[in-house]
Amino acid sequence: MCFKKIITTIAVGLCFTAFVFSQEVEVVSPWNFSITTDFAYYPKSDYVAGNTHFAPLTGAYSGLEGRVTGSATYTIPTPLGEHWLLNSATLDLTGELEVSPVSIKPALKIKWTPLPFIVFSAGGSAGTGWNLAGLQGMAELAEDGKSYNDLKPFGTYFVKWFAQGTFQFDTGAVIAGDWTHFQIMYTYQVYSEMLTGIKNQTVWEWQCSGNKVNGLQNYQNLVLAYQMPLTLSRVGVLTEIESHYNKKAYLNPLYKSDFKKISISPLAQFTFDEHNSLAILAGFSSRRSFTTDHKESIEETALTYSGYEWFFNRIALSWTYTF
């Protein structure tokens, strides 16, 4: 059993709940508290050598992942004028605590919305991990390249910071009606992640997701969605692109350090009441393909890149309870 990484995909799916600038919202308190439970199921797709291709499913199970995140947000009105485009500006200060079976990670974030369709965000997090029944939360690749060696919890830390800008638009802002909400959201994020005490180009693992190295990276997502006044409140498609900036982030120059991972995920969001919402994603993703066959991902950083391998990656669910 191996936990894998739920990247920001689920968080993006749930941020739809805030993507309603065209609607009237009554602010009762500047505080907002929520708990989000994430779960992902990964079927098995064996690796296939060669140029760009699709890898079919070869098994029912490859891994599971789960985590719980508590969040507290304080909203400060920052109106820039009396015009309706300017008078709703806000500054959000958020603290989070993420807990998984193999890690714990607090985070701080700041978000400024100067205009209804523009959002700027930045933040950072620091966490640590441990081994639980063979599930490695934080580890370094062994010298022989065949296993990961556990790192000491609270002796080594995973550190990440990010800065991003988001453009969002809802046709309901200009066309009134319950059924007029076609939505678009695009985000570009610059981020850095590292393990303290680990040298650059050294391969490491965090939350059972391996083949990582320290470095500056970028993440983009594009959401196209339609909102409805139903329990099934939103359907759409999420497209994500992620890569390292540095072409020499990995020691092996043939691994293609700046490979762009692409994910395309149909999504649905259910809003059951003012407290409970559920996002569901079915993710198709790309990963590196190599010139030679291999069985395990731990072998990959020593191989030669040859193209894209597309596969069905996971089904992910995220339940949010807002107090």
Give the ranges of each region predicted by the language model.
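Outer-membrane beta-barrel initiation region
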Residues: 23-83, 215-217
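Transmembrane beta-strand segments that form the barrel wall of outer-membrane beta-barrel proteins
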Residues: 35-41, 55-56, 88-101, 105-108, ...
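Transmembrane beta-strands of outer-membrane beta-barrel pores
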Residues: 39-45, 74-78, 97-101, 114, ...
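Solvent-exposed loop/turn segments connecting transmembrane beta-strands
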Residues: 60-67, 95-108, 114-117, 128, ...
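Repeated loop/turn-to-beta-strand initiation elements of outer-membrane beta-barrel proteins
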Residues: 79-84, 116-120, 173-184, 229-237, ...
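Extracellular/periplasm-exposed beta-strand and loop segments of Gram-negative cell-envelope proteins
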Residues: 95-98, 133-141, 145-162, 193-202, ...
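Hydrophobic, aromatic-enriched interface-forming segments
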Residues: 159-229
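Outer-membrane beta-barrel "beta-signal"
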Residues: 161-164, 168, 306-323
